[in-house]
A protein has these predicted regions:
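Active-site beta-strand->loop->alpha-helix modules in alpha/beta enzyme cores, enriched
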Residues: 1-124, 130, 171
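The feature marks non-catalytic terminal segments
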Residues: 55, 59, 89, 94, ...
Length: 175
């Protein structure tokens, strides 16, 4: 189970890994915010689906919630309940979520609730460059060059964010 607060988080943090393991194991990706309240991001949800499909995921492996961006702390209980539903439905062996060193309020809430919801399950944190502070991983997962290239291709589908520094190929390749 891969969980991210916003469209692009999962791809930024785990895109190469997803590309490497898709088709070899059961996968499910849950993005908690659709960002629909921001008129500048009107195409973001479509870009997210295209990006995830580029990584090899099917639409039935992708779910997007409607929690409002920057308001996750206000909906902590509802987020926890959604995670408990996912736990019952999917029975994941491993959960990927934002690193505990992330400072974005939505990412912090998601990680804290994941640690509560998935007690007894391996929960691993991934880095999203633009919002983590002091990220010192306990271990790294090796990914293939093909996986990295697929991550870069997938993130190129986000025309909304094309000019942001963390979407440059050099930055994506190094993260």
């Amino acid at each position: 189970l891969f969980m991210g607060a916003h469209p692009d988080d999962i791809e930024l943090g785990c895109g190469a890994l997803l590309a490497d393991i898709v088709g070899r194991t059961e996968l499910y990706c849950m993005t908690f915010s659709d960002n629909k309240k921001n008129p500048d991001l009107q195409h973001l949800l479509d870009e997210h689906y295209v990006s995830m499909r580029t990584l090899g995921l099917r639409d039935d492996q992708i779910e997007v919630g409607s929690f409002e961006t920057r308001r996750f702390p206000d909906f902590r209980q509802e987020i926890l309940e959604k995670m408990l539903q996912l736990k019952r439905k999917l029975k994941p062996q491993i959960v990927f979520v934002h690193t505990a060193q992330d400072i974005h309020q939505d990412h912090v809430t998601l990680t804290q609730e994941a640690l509560r919801a998935f007690r007894g399950t391996t929960v691993l944190g991934y880095d999203v460059l633009r919002s983590s502070y002091g990220f010192f991983p306990h271990f790294l997962v090796e990914v293939s060059e093909a996986g990295v290239n697929k991550k870069i291709e997938a993130l190129s589908k986000y025309t909304t964010y094309a000019e942001r520094y963390y979407f440059s190929e050099d930055v994506l390749r190094s993260t």
